[in-house]
Curated annotation (Swiss-Prot), chain B:
Major subcellular site: cytoplasm
GO molecular function, one term: beta-catenin binding
Residues with N-acetylserine modification: 2
Species name: Rattus norvegicus
Protein role: May regulate a number of protein-protein interactions by competing for PDZ domain binding sites. Binds CTNNB1 and may thereby act as an inhibitor of the Wnt signaling pathway. Competes with LIN7A for KCNJ4 binding, and thereby promotes KCNJ4 internalization. May play a role in the Rho signaling pathway.
Annotated localization: Cytoplasm; Nucleus; Cell membrane
Identification of the protein by name: Tax1-binding protein 3
Statement: the UniProt record of this protein carries the keyword Cell membrane: yes
Keywords of the record: Acetylation, Cell membrane, Cytoplasm, Membrane, Nucleus, Wnt signaling pathway
Gene Ontology BP, a term: Rho protein signal transduction
Membrane topology qualifier: Peripheral membrane protein
DNA-binding is among the record's keywords: no
Disulfide-bonded cysteines: none
Gene: Tax1bp3
Domain PDZ: 12-87
Amino acid sequence: MPAETLGEQSPGSQASLATMPEAPDVLEETVTVEEDPGTPTSHVSIVTSEDGTTRRTETKVTKTVKTVTTRTVRQVPLGPDGLPLLDGGPPLGPFADGALDRHFLLRGGGPAATLSRAYLSSGAGFPEGPEPRDSSSYGSLSRGLGVRPPRAGPLGPGPGDGCFTLPGHREAFSVGPEPGPPGGRSLPERFQAEPYGLEDDTRSLAADDEGGPELEPDYGTATRRRPECGRGLHTRAYEDAADDGGELTDQRPAFPAVTAPLAQPERGSLGSLDRLVRRSPSVDSARKEPRWRDPELPEVLAMLRHPVDPVKANAAAYLQHLCFENEGVKRRVRQLRGLPLLVALLDHPRAEVRRRACGALRNLSYGRDTDNKAAIRDCGGVPALVRLLRAARDNEVRELVTGTLWNLSSYEPLKMVIIDHGLQTLTHEVIVPHSGWEREPNEDSKPRDAEWTTVFKNTSGCLRNVSSDGAEARRRLRECEGLVDALLHALQSAVGRKDTDNKSVENCVCIMRNLSYHVHKEVPGADRYQEAEPGPLGSAVVSQRRRRDDASCFGGKKAKGKKDGEMDRNFDTLDLPKRTEAAKGFELLYQPEVVRLYLSLLTESRNFNTLEAAAGALQNLSAGNWMWATYIRATVRKERGLPVLVELLQSETDKVVRAVAIALRNLSLDRRNKDLIGSYAMAELVRNVRNAQAPPRPGARLEEDTVVAVLNTIHEIVSDSLDNARSLLQARGVPALVALVASSQSVREAKAASHVLQTVWSYKELRGSLQKDGWTKARFQSAAATAKGPKGAPSPGGFDDSTLPLVDKSLEGEKTGSQDVIPMDALGPDGYSTVDRRERRPRGIGSAGEASEKEPLKLDPSRKAPPPGPSRPAVRLVDAVGDAKPQPVDSWV
Amino acid sequence: MSYIPGQPVTAVVQRVEIHKLRQGENLILGFSIGGGIDQDPSQNPFSEDKTDKVNGWDMTMVTHDQARKRLTKRSEEVVRLLVTRQSLQKAVQQSMLS
C-alpha cells in the first residue's frame, strides 16, 4: 500500500497509465467521420468554375455511415513543363486568400457534375464501392483547403504557376465522397481507381474509429487512415486529360467507404513541393503516367516554413496524418526539430494554419514516448496553446488545443507548467461556461445545465491529470476562482439529468476527489476546525450554527436546491460552524451537502472510474480529525449512504471495492457508523476475503491492494467493538482469514489477515466460542507467525494496541489502502480509462477517432493500466460547418 | 464591422432576453434567422442584426444549423442573446465622437 504520503497513486503507475500505448485503439487522427446513424444529412456541393458559373448539387444522404477515410497524398502530375498538369483552364488560386473556400465545400461527393468542366470530360472514374458517406467526409475536402465558409463565386484566378494542383483540388472534391446510393445521383464520370506508382503506404494502421456520442452530427471528421492495403484504390480527383488519371489525392477508405479526398491540402503542398523540388522521379521519364511520390518528412517540415500560408496549413495537416499512430514519425519530427516550427505556427495570423498546426501537435503530443511532450514544453508550447485557446472562437480549434493540453498533462513535469500557464484560462474559458454555473445566479432563471462538450471533456481531463500533482497543484486548483463551484454545479447537473456515465463526469469527480485529499490539512484555516480526535457527534468545537433554510448557507448554489430543508434536519444534533456567508470555492469541497452528490453518483453511475472517484472523495473527506470530517461522516449515515457503499462492495471491479472499503473504514471513525457498518457490511467484507482466498472463478481474484484494504477495514471495525468482532465470527470470517493467511502469496495480505485475527483473539469474551469452534491460540498464533511477526500490521505503525488514539487509525485509513486520493492522473487522453472496462459503455470516447480505441480497450481485462485513452484526434478535416449553400437559408425558430 | 479572420473582434452588443412561447408542444421564439458561417454572407436575408451569443453559446462561428439548434433547445425557456447591430455600432460611435 502506498504510504499516505501520496494520497495519490504513485505517479509512476499513473504515468504508465497516462501514456497510453499506442494501441490501435487509440486514434490520433481526427479525421473521423462519425455521424449518428440514421441521421439524414444533406450535402451540397458547389463547384465554381472560373468562368463564374456555379454548380450546386445537393445530395441527400439518408444513411449515415461511419466513415473511415484514408488519405493518401499524391503529387500532382507534372506536365511536360514541369508544372502540374492541369486540364485546361487556368489554375485556381487555391492559395489565394479565400478563394479556396468557395470551391471546395464539396459535400456528398457531388458527382462529376460538380467537376469543373475540364475534368469532367476526362471521364475520370469515381472510386467504386464507397458507401454513402455522410457529408462530413466531404466537408473534409473543403477543410483540407482550410477554408470554411463557402462563398459562391468564381474560382479565382490561380497562381500562374498552376503548380498547385488546383484542378486536382476541384476534382478531388467532386470525386471524393461517394455520396448516397449510387442510383441516387448521377455519376457521369467514373474514375478508374488504379494504383499509380504509389508505394504502399504502410505508415499507420488506422484503427477503426467509432464515433462517440459527443460528436455532433455536423461534424464531419473523416478518419484518416492509411490502411496497409496500399494505395490501390484512389479517388481520382480528376482525370487528367493527358493521362488516365492523375490522381491527386488518394483517399482511400479502408473499407468500402467513401473516401474523402482529403488531400487537398497535401495536394497543394505537394504541388508546391513539386515545383520547388522537382523530385518527382518519374515525371521526366513518363509524362504519360506520372509517378507520384509522397513528400519526405524533411520536405514536409520545410513546407511548414513556406511563405504561402495554405502550404503551411496543408503541410501541417499532412504531418498530422503522418504522425498518426506512428511513433517513429513522431520521433523523427522531433529530431528534425519540427516541433518548434509547429508551436510557432500556433500564433500565425491565419486561422487555418493555426488549426492545422494544432492538429499536428495534438498527434505529436500523444503517445508513450514523453520526449515529444517535453520538447513541446521546451519550445514554449504550453503558453502558445493557452493563447490560442483564449483567442480561438472556433470550436474545433478549442477542441484541438484542449486535447493537446490533455495529452501533455499526463507527463508529470508538465503538470505544473500547465497549471501556471493554463489554469485560469481553462477554468474561465471552458469549465465555467460549459458547466452551467453562474457566478451571480440570476434569481429568475433556472440554473443552467452543464453542456457536455468535447472541449469540456478535454479540459476536465487535463485538469484531472494536473490535480494529481501534489499539494501545490491541489492548492492552486482549490484556489482557482470558480473552479470548484463550476465542477460541483456540473456534477449536480449531471445527476439531475441522470447522465452520470460520461467521461466528463468522470473527470470532474476525479478532480473533486483529488482536491478533497488532505483538505483537513491543506485548506486555509483548517486548523481552526481541528479536533483532538474524532469525537462523538455534537462535540464539535464551534458554536452553534444558525440553521437556516437558506440555500446560500450551503454554498450559494442555485442548484437543484431541494436539499436545503432536508439538510437542516440532518444536523439537528450537530453543530455546524457558523456561516456568515455562503460557502464558495474550495469550501464547497467539504460542505456536508456534497455528500448527497457523491452518494447520488455512487447510486446512479455505472462508470467504474466515477464510482471509484466518488467513493474516494468520501474516503478523503471522512479522513482527518477536523470538524468537517465529523459532519461528513455523520451526514453519510443520515443520507443513508452506508447501504449504498456496502452494496458496492459487491462490485466486480477491484478498484471500486477497494475505494469503498477504505471509505467505510474512514467512516467507521464515527462510532455509530462503526456499529452499523459492523452489522451490515461484515458479510460483504468477509465475502470479499473469501473470494480473495478462494476465488470462485479464475480471473476473479482480487488484487492485493484490494484485499489488504478490505482486511484493514475489517480490522478497523472489529477493533474496540466487541459486537463487531462477534459479527465477524458469525459471518464465518475466522476460517476465511486463517485460510488466507495460510494460502496467500502476498505478505501484506497475510499480515493484515493475521492482524485481524489477533485483534479478535484479544477479546476474552470470544475465546469461548472460538475454542468451541476448534480454534486455539496456537492456531491463531501460527497464523500470525506465518505472517511474519506478531504485530504484523498492514500499515506502518501497527496498531494492535487499541489504546492508540483513533487518530492514528484514521491517518492510517488515509495512508494505507490503496489510495487516499486517487489522482487518476494519467487518465487523460493518454490514459483513457473510460473504455477499458468491459462493462463500461465506451461513451467517453466520443468524438472523432477516439472510438477506435474502444475495441481493444474492451478486451483489456487488466484494470491496472487502463489503456490509454485516445488523444482526441487532432484534425478534423471536415469542416464542422454545414454545407455550402448558395442560397441563404433561414429558419423559423 | 470589418474584421480580420482569426483576430478577435470587438463589437457593441445589446443584450436581449426572450422568453420562448409555448406553441403546442414546442417552445418557439417567433422569428426567423438566417445566415451562419456556412452560408453565403452576401445573400443573408437579415443582415441587420447579428447574434454573438446565445445563452452563453458563442455564435460567431457557427453554421446555420448549429445556430438554429442553439436557439431552439427544448430545455431552455429563456434565450439570452447578445446581438450586434450596425445601427447600434454607429450610434455608439457617434455618441462617443460627440
